Regions:
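Non-catalytic connector elements of ABC transporters
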Residues: 2-12, 21, 266, 276-390
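ABC ATPase nucleotide-binding domains
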Residues: 60, 99-261
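The feature captures the beta-strand-to-loop junction immediately N-terminal to the Walker
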Residues: 64-66
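Helix-to-loop junction immediately C-terminal to a conserved catalytic motif
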Residues: 79
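Conserved coupling/switch loops of ABC nucleotide-binding domains, chiefly the family-specific signature
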Residues: 85-88, 138, 238, 270
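Conserved ABC transporter NBD signature motif
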Residues: 87-95
């Protein structure tokens, strides 16, 4: 097997913005990792069920889902820590079933970091290289290179208990990378960090992955984390892949009510399709009247569908919009959540359903024009409505 990192690092597409990196759209592109109908069962529980997935060289891929959905099991199968009951896992076209974990060019960074408390930072990073019996001079050079890469120069002689949580996370990352794997697996790597540090570290991970050109696969239940770092996201539930797409596609074009509800905040309105045009779908809803959506759909007249609306795409005002009664509902403000950058209004419609509208706080310390118990109108553009058939 060749060096997957070098290939992707020299890819002119990869050297531009992350948006230009899209090998999954190229039918001739070859996957580095392929799950082919993989299943894994523990007792009577199907942890992973018939998963097929391609991950490409140089890709930052996120497995996202609630606890117990099978994402960590999928990671362990790739690492060789568990064995599939069905299906194959290929690395660069070769079935890796016969290859033991320590022979696979794959490293895994665990949520707990698993640092050796009796070893220094340098000792922890060098541990795997010493196990391989590399010359001392090479070990020293590679450890120094990794510590510089993760910005831990000058801390090599410290023990783990003398480091902050963020520094321990970097030591674990350096130890995972020092053996130069083709694929790095990250199991909830930022879960132990506070929110601010977690946000900063997400961008550091992205920059590091871009610089090295390696394939990263991260497991997380944090939607914001997955949306921030990943080129693509695989959303999992009950052992199955529900949708695989880029972060904007997952957010703006979810393939089901479940994905729409799991990724961020959403208003879901049930209705029945009245008409399907070339670019527009008309829905009749008992909750919200007549709705128009500029959303691609395979729905037919008479089908029951869900209409998903992100709160930030819903306008809130004291007066109805001049466009008329379509895509417009009236209600009363029941609650207001101030989130700093946003204010979220919970509005109880006349039929009892609650919808949310999110408004950016673009001015400072200005009294809200809309308050509790106000009578308001919610409206949205047709392109803001997503039609979901399942």
């Amino acid at each position: 097997m060749g060096n997957g990192g070098a290939d992707s690092r020299n890819d002119p597409q990869r050297q531009g913005t992350r948006r230009t990196f899209a090998p999954w759209t190229d039918p001739t592109a070859r996957a580095l990792v392929r799950f082919d109908g993989v299943s894994k069962q523990f007792a009577a529980v199907a942890a992973v069920e018939r998963v097929s997935l391609d991950i490409f060289p140089g890709e930052f891929f996120a497995l996202l889902g609630p606890s117990g959905c099978g994402k960590t099991t999928l990671l362990r199968l790739l690492a060789g820590l568990d064995t599939p009951d069905e299906g194959r896992i290929l690395l660069d076209g070769e079935d890796i079933a016969p290859v033991p974990p320590y022979r696979r060019p794959i490293n895994m960074m665990f949520q707990s970091y698993a640092l050796f408390p009796h070893l220094t930072v340098e000792g922890n990073v060098a541990f795997g290289l010493k196990q391989e019996g590399l010359p001392k001079t090479e070990i020293t050079a590679r450890v120094e290179e990794m510590l510089a890469l993760v910005r831990l120069e000058g801390l090599g002689k410290r023990k783990p208990h003398q480091l902050s949580g963020g520094q321990r996370q970097r030591v674990a990352l350096a130890r995972s990378l020092v053996k130069r794997p083709r694929v790095l697996l990250l199991d909830e790597p930022l879960a132990a960090l506070d929110k601010k540090l977690r946000g900063e570290t997400q961008f550091e991970l992205m920059q590091l992955q871009e610089r090295l050109g390696l394939t990263f696969v991260i497991v997380t239940h944090d939607q914001q984390e997955a949306m921030t770092v990943a080129d693509r996201i695989g959303v999992m539930d009950h052992g199955r892949l529900i949708q695989v797409a880029t972060p904007p596609e997952i957010y703006e074009r979810p393939n089901s009510r479940w994905v729409a509800d799991f990724i961020g905040e959403v208003n879901l309105i049930e209705g029945r399709v009245v008409d399907v045009g070339a670019s527009e779908t008309v829905i009749a809803s008992a909750a919200a009247g007549r709705l128009r959506a500029l959303s691609p759909t395979d729905a037919k007249p008479g089908d029951v569908v869900g209409v998903a609306l992100r709160p930030e795409k819903v306008r809130i005002a004291h007066a109805p919009p001049p466009t008329g009664g379509e895509n417009c509902v009236a209600g009363q403000v029941g609650n207001i959540g101030y989130l700093g950058d946003l204010s979220v209004y919970k509005v109880r419609l006349d039929n009892g359903i609650v919808m949310k509208a999110a408004v950016a706080n673009v001015t400072r310390l200005v009294e809200r024009p809309i308050g509790w118990d106000d009578r308001v109108w919610l409206s949205w553009a047709p392109e803001a409505a997503m039609v979901l058939t399942r």
